[in-house]
UniProtKB/Swiss-Prot annotation:
Phylogenetic classification of the source organism: Eukaryota, Metazoa, Chordata, Craniata, Vertebrata
Enzyme Commission no: 3.6.5.2
Motif extent (Effector region): 58-66
Gene behind the chain: Rras
PROSITE patterns referenced in this protein's UniProt entry, alphabetically: RAS (PS51421)
Protein name: Ras-related protein R-Ras
Binding site for GTP: 36-44, 83-87, 142-145, 172-174
Length: 218
């Protein structure tokens, strides 16, 4: 479970207060990036996680940043979250924020087939920019409340995520379904990845014996 305080720089959107006196100091900082096609609900997911508020009107985002200090699995962390543009005209900005991210929430809408095709391209681009075969990424099928309009089967998305070593969540920003769970899992994935990337600690040198004979005082 997570808990904490939040703040944001979203234009015209509600802001949370800064960390309160009861919030533990963060022991770690993670830069998380929310990516996906236009209109899939990236901002709605982010604001619901940050401020427990559902944004119903679609307002195309250029770039908004938020901060949340929370505790995941008993460990306090500062999350710097970047909500990115999904519109094609802002595609040139993608590689810039991909270079800075420690982990990615890859979002499509279950009622939008094209957005699912888009996440495959974004996944490939992230690995290319990072020059890695693997990276901390969580796949989210948003708008699960629109089940009757579904265009992407759950089994299809699950198969795609499993083949690329990602955890998959079907979420709804409107219902606050699996919103916290997706972000918390991304934090866990980032932690695990960073632990694996750390170089092993050098073995401690054995203590040398001084070679002197023990003395007995009479």
């Amino acid at each position: 479970m997570s808990s904490g305080a939040a703040s944001g720089t979203g234009r015209g959107r509600p802001r949370g207060g800064g960390p309160g006196p009861r919030d533990p100091p963060p022991g770690e900082t993670h830069k998380l990036v929310v990516v996906g096609g236009g209109g899939v609900g990236k901002s709605a997911l982010t604001i619901q996680f940050i401020q427990s508020y559902f944004v119903s009107d679609y307002d195309p985002t250029i770039e908004d940043s938020y901060t949340k200090i929370c505790t995941v699995d008993g460990i306090p962390a500062r999350l710097d979250i970047l909500d990115t543009a999904g519109q094609e005209e802002f595609g040139a900005m993608r590689e810039q924020y991909m270079r800075a991210g420690n982990g990615f929430l890859l979002v499509f809408a279950i009622n939008d087939r094209q957005s699912f095709i888009e996440v495959s391209k974004l996944f490939t681009q992230i690995l290319r920019v990072k020059d890695r075969d693997d990276f901390p990424i969580v796949l989210v099928g948003n708008k699960a409340d629109l089940e009757t309009q579904r265009q992407v089967l759950r089994s299809e998305a699950s198969s795609f995520s499993a083949s690329h070593h990602m955890t998959y969540f079907e979420a709804s920003a409107k219902l606050r379904l699996n919103v916290d769970e997706a972000f918390e899992q991304l934090v866990r994935t980032v932690r695990k990845y960073q632990e694996q990337e750390l170089p092993p600690s050098p073995p401690s040198a054995p203590r040398k014996k001084d070679g002197r004979c023990p003395c007995v005082l009479l």
